[in-house]
Amino acid sequence: LYHTSLVDTVNERHFAAVLPEVFESCFVNMNIGDRYESFVAKELPSTIHNMFACISDDRKYNYVSGFSNGGYGCLHSALKYPSTFSKVGAFSAGDKADSVFVNDNSTKAKNRILLFGDKDIHNTDYCLTYLADKLIADNKKALAPDIYHACGSLDPWLDMNHIVRDYFLEHNDFYNY
């Protein structure tokens, strides 16, 4: 990370950047496997705030960001745990619920089953629009995180990103694309 814009920005703006290893977990508690959602959204923030008194636990100072699977994961974490994160930077972050699942015994299918199971994940906590709808229905819109979402025009998952974009532009005022 040395000699990167991240290090320069951290030094210039005086904030802590924590980059946990979450493999290809999408920051979720896996159907079969590790509990990355609990780690990223609960354990890690608690550990950081307990170990480093200079890092505030006030949600307004706690952001989550990610790219691709991590982009989905950071949106998932912030929408499911709105009292933890106030802002999201989601890059190339489509909703995994919008990805067609074919159980063809491929590595991709096996990984999807490990993460989410073999059922449709719409209307579950794995679906970003479901989590956002739940946040609004539970009258917690004031806790909704500010979302910055970006995706390059040549990204192979651009269509999935546009589905997420269109949903948030239609339903929420805390979203920027």
Task: List the predicted regions and their residue ranges.
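Non-catalytic cap/lid and distal C-terminal segments of serine-dependent acyl enzymes
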Residues: L1-Y177
